[in-house]
C-alpha cells in the first residue's frame, strides 16, 4: 500500500477534506478599468472513516503447563502479524479493484474512482481511458496523453505527468518489456521506445500481488492530494489471561 497512498495521521473517528474549485483564467485588465473578481467554490467533501482491525489467538492453560508456550507463541505471533498485514493490503487495493466504472467504490464527487464523467464546475473530466484496454504500447501512450490533458475544476490545464505504474503480477513481464526495451515492443520497425527515451513514468512500475484483476493497470500522477491513507493508531499487541479458562 505504501506505493499507492500518501499516508497521513489521524486523531478522530473520521477525516474530511473539502474540495475547492480555485479560480478561472485571469483576464486582461483594460487601462482605468476595475479588476475582475472571481469566487472559489466548495465542490464536494471527501470523508475518510477510520476502522479498527483486530485479531487474537489463545493458548490453553494446559499447553503452558506443558512448557509449549514459547514454541507455540512464536509461531502464532508471526502468523498473526501476517494476517494483520494481509488485511491492510487487501483493504488498500479495494478502491482500485472496485473503483472501475462498473464497480461500487465511489469518491467524494459521487462517481466511481475511475470514470470518464467526474463532474467539475467547468464540465466533466476523465481519469481513465475512454475505451478500456490491456497494458500495451498504444494504451500506455494514450494514457500519458490523457494525463497531460487533465484540467482542474475550472478547466485550467495542470500539466500533470505520470510518475509510477501499479500492476498485478500477471502483467509484470509486459511492463518490463515496455519500460526497459530500447526499441518498440513487438514490432520489426526500427523505432525507439518513446516512453523510455522521453523518461516518462520516471518511477517505473510496482507489482502489487493483492490486485485481483489480472489485466488492470494504474498510473499514479504528480497531481497533489491524490490517494491518501490515514493511520489513527499504529499496530499494537497485548496479552491477557482468561479468568474462566486460564487460557492466555
Language-model regions: role of each:
Residues 1-53:
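Assembly/oligomerization interface modules of large self-assembling protein complexes
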Residues 3-6, 157-163:
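Short coil/turn segments at secondary-structure boundaries
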Residues 13-18, 22, 43, 47, ...:
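Short, charged/polar micro-motifs that form catalytic or ligand-binding hotspots
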Residues 45, 60-64, 85, 92, ...:
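An acidic- and aromatic-residue-enriched active-site/binding cleft used to recognize and process polar
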Residues 51-66, 121-124, 159-164:
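Glycine-rich, often proline-containing surface loops adjacent to acidic residues and nearby aromatics
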Residues 67-75, 82-146:
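Alpha-helical scaffold segments that mediate packing/assembly in large oligomeric complexes
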Residues 101, 105, 153-158:
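Surface-exposed acidic, glycine-flexible loop patches that form ligand/cofactor-binding
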Residues 112-152, 159-164, 170-248:
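Sequence/fold signature of self-assembling virion shell proteins
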